Amino acid sequence: FGPSSQDEGSFEFTEIGLNVSLRPHQDVLLAAQMLSRRAGGDSSDAYPKLDYGLIDYQMVSDQQRTFGIQLGRIKNPFGFYNQTRDVAFTRPSILLPQSLYFDRTRSLALTGDGVTLYLEERLDNGVIRGQLGLGKPQADKDLNQTLRLHRRPGSFEPQQSAIAQLRYEDD
């Protein structure tokens, strides 16, 4: 990454996270993660910030199905890797394919502040998983710089948006 192929390595790609997960009741999960990340650029973009922070309430959880709701800053169900893109061993490479997971505008696609409903239905031959979310996407300074919005009059303010994902996993 960066000048590592020309020299003896590089510290231009660094990630460190601190997460906490607490289950105050068998149906309730509180979880949060602070993340400091730098992918090229200067060290000023490595300040820690809230990656996700949520309250998860499972209304139904048994052998057949799981149904719940999450409130807070939630990872968007976008593509295969977005929800786990900051977990190194879930990535196929150091950086995800940039055609889908563009790191320069990652704040817009990564998380949103809002609510998500989720369902997991276990069938005889597989599992159906679905998520439906409503929230306000994050728009950090990386988005304004990448899209060169600081050169234009006005401002970029994200609006409420919806996102959904439906998956089937065969046994």
Predicted regions and their residues:
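Loop-centered beta-sheet repeat module
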Residues: P137-D171
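Surface-exposed strand-loop-strand hairpins of Gram-negative outer-membrane beta-barrel proteins
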Residues: F1-T14, Q145-R152
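Outer membrane beta-barrel
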Residues: D7-D140, L166-D170
